[in-house]
Amino acid sequence: MKIGIIGAMEPEVAHLIAAMTNASSQTIAGIEFIAGTLAGKDVVVTRSGIGKVAASIATTLLIEKYAPDAVINTGSAGGFVDSLSIGDIVISSEVRHHDVDVTAFGYEIGQMAQQPAAFIPAPYLVEAANKAIKQLGEVKAIEGLICTGDSFICDPVRTKTMLEHFPTMAACEMEGAAIAQVCHQFGMPFVVIRSLSDNANNDSPVDFDSYIVKAGYHSALMVMLLLEQLDPNSVK
């Protein structure tokens, strides 16, 4: 079993890379891919860069060059659930674009033309993540809708509009739906796991800078615990 792991920023992948053994590195199109062993599984970890285009490029290269059995997107997010605090975790129940609008042609808000409205993670990856939750100690984790767009959300007006469009949204970030869309195109199982670095409000820029390392660590810890739970025979 080989798992591809994608984070956008250095703090989101640093703990994973530090924990790897037998690591080797290759750079393709300016993106570094580090192959090795993590939590008893063969993995390839990459830092994609921020945003949907960067994430799409990295995901495509990862799948084409390394042929993983599944892809995990890890990192930080802005939170929309009152019961969660900074550092807590959202496991994707579904992933959607929040900044896509082709409703003039009969699509749902957030649905890209000729694509599903929501991208659904592989049940066996979500199941493994839920088993891993029990080992997180005081860190809370829930399943929920994660939305993606090419903007850092810190405007209450925009937050209000997003919640009107996606009332069940638990978190927002800048790469997950792009990664999910590429995985959908390739028939690749995926899951998105995000730790909250801020609450998508006026304080978000300050909170993000203060808590990105904490969020990156918690998300990385969740990924490692998930890997431990994965049964190689469960890939499907």
Swiss-Prot record:
Q: What does this protein do?
A: Catalyzes the irreversible cleavage of the glycosidic bond in both 5'-methylthioadenosine (MTA) and S-adenosylhomocysteine (SAH/AdoHcy) to adenine and the corresponding thioribose, 5'-methylthioribose and S-ribosylhomocysteine, respectively. Also cleaves 5'-deoxyadenosine, a toxic by-product of radical S-adenosylmethionine (SAM) enzymes, into 5-deoxyribose and adenine.
Kindly give the Gene3D superfamilies that the UniProt entry links to this protein.
Nucleoside phosphorylase domain (3.40.50.1580)
Tell me the residue numbers annotated for binding substrate: 78, 153, 174-175
**Example of a GO MF term:** adenosylhomocysteine nucleosidase activity
Provide a GO biological process annotation: L-methionine salvage from S-adenosylmethionine
The alphabetical list of record keywords is: Amino-acid biosynthesis, Hydrolase, Methionine biosynthesis
Keyword Nuclease appears in the UniProt entry: no
Enzyme category, top tier: hydrolase
Pathway given for this chain reads:
Amino-acid biosynthesis; L-methionine biosynthesis via salvage pathway; S-methyl-5-thio-alpha-D-ribose 1-phosphate from S-methyl-5'-thioadenosine (hydrolase route): step 1/2
Catalytic activity reads: S-adenosyl-L-homocysteine + H2O = S-(5-deoxy-D-ribos-5-yl)-L-homocysteine + adenine; S-methyl-5'-thioadenosine + H2O = 5-(methylsulfanyl)-D-ribose + adenine; 5'-deoxyadenosine + H2O = 5-deoxy-D-ribose + adenine
Q: Which domain of life is it from?
A: Bacteria
Q: What is this protein called?
A: 5'-methylthioadenosine/S-adenosylhomocysteine nucleosidase
Q: Which Pfam families match?
A: PNP_UDP_1
Instruction: Quote the gene name from the UniProt entry.
Output: mtnN
Name the InterPro entries for this protein: MTA_SAH_Nsdase, Nucleoside_phosphorylase_d, Nucleoside_phosphorylase_sf
Could you state one GO cellular component term attached to this entry?
cytosol
Identify its protein family.
Belongs to the PNP/UDP phosphorylase family. MtnN subfamily.
Keyword Amino-acid biosynthesis in record: yes
Under Enzyme Commission nomenclature, its number is 3.2.2.9
User: What is annotated as the active site?
Assistant: 12 (proton acceptor), 198 (proton donor)
